[in-house]
Amino acid sequence: MAIQLPGFTMKNPLMPASGTFGFGEGYAKEYDLNLLGALVTKSTTLAPRIGNQGTIFADGPDSTLNAVGLKNPGSDVVLHEKLPWLATQYPDLPIIASIAGVDVAEYAAVAKKLSAAPNVKALEVNISCPNVKQGGMAFGTDPEVAAAVTRAVKAASSVPIFVKLTPNVTDITAIAKAVEQAGADGLSLINTFVGMRLDIATGKPLLDNVTGGVSGPALLPMALHMVYQVAHAVRVPLIGMGGISSGHDAAEMLAAGATALAVGSANYYQKRAIPKIAAELAAIQEGQTVL
């Protein structure tokens, strides 16, 4: 089922969520990345970031907690190495470059730089990372600040922009409306919830960062609700994500109002998660029974 989004067409509605897929190199050893509808890169900042140190992952029975901290090689490496590799290996695969920054100026600078790459069809503006001390989620919890980032990126970018929303707000529709009015061509939602786990023997947090972003199947009901709310509040297309791990989950997210879908932590548990979900979704849409 082909999907039309601003700036490009996807052969199917599924893509990896930013941060869970790197730049595709590892997963390219597992399957043909042309099976994806699009590929969303790891969030990139102007300069390299080493991310958070120490323990950055903690798994639960139905969720994963991470505090990676936007670790990335920086915009120069992405522009001159990562994106050209994708263009050479997968010339027909639409690339959505995820960008982040510590201030509005950095967002704009990265947007201008990466949107110039020939295979980048859109940008995803990450204003919702909960694991960094500067920037990140701070930009996504205030409608005026979120709108300011959106306007700056829109002015700097030569491709459509999708703003990635945080669920860690009282009213996600207020943020959605603000960034839509500021020029967003689409929205991605939801990013992770802030959470923590503790070692009951010591009483100390499992993560050195204390808190992290909660993802995984446990998020699906909340993600569906927020996508449903936003779909009824804005007119731009939505990339829905949060807890998708099966074709049934994907079908629910589309029913909630998403135009396209991103799969995150399921990639950690099963390398071929996206092709599996795509096949299950196609079967459901064709009226077949999926076990």
Swiss-Prot record:
Its cofactor is FMN. Binds 1 FMN per subunit. Keywords: Cytoplasm, Flavoprotein, FMN, Oxidoreductase, Pyrimidine biosynthesis. FMN binds at S18, K42, S43, N126, K164, I190, G216, G242, G243, G264, S265. Pathway: Pyrimidine metabolism; UMP biosynthesis via de novo pathway. GO terms for biological process: 'de novo' pyrimidine nucleobase biosynthetic process; 'de novo' UMP biosynthetic process. It is an enzyme of class 1 (oxidoreductase). Its EC number is 1.3.98.1. The active site is at C129. Its main location: cytoplasm. Signal peptide: none annotated. One of its GO terms (cellular component) is cytoplasm. It is found in: Cytoplasm. It comes from the Bacteria. GO terms for molecular function: dihydroorotate dehydrogenase (fumarate) activity. Substrate binds at K42, N66, A67, V68, G69, L70, N126, N191, T192. It catalyses: (S)-dihydroorotate + fumarate = orotate + succinate. NCBIfam families: PRK07259.1, pyrD_sub1_fam. Homodimer. Catalyzes the conversion of dihydroorotate to orotate with fumarate as the electron acceptor. Belongs to the dihydroorotate dehydrogenase family. Type 1 subfamily. This is Dihydroorotate dehydrogenase A (fumarate).
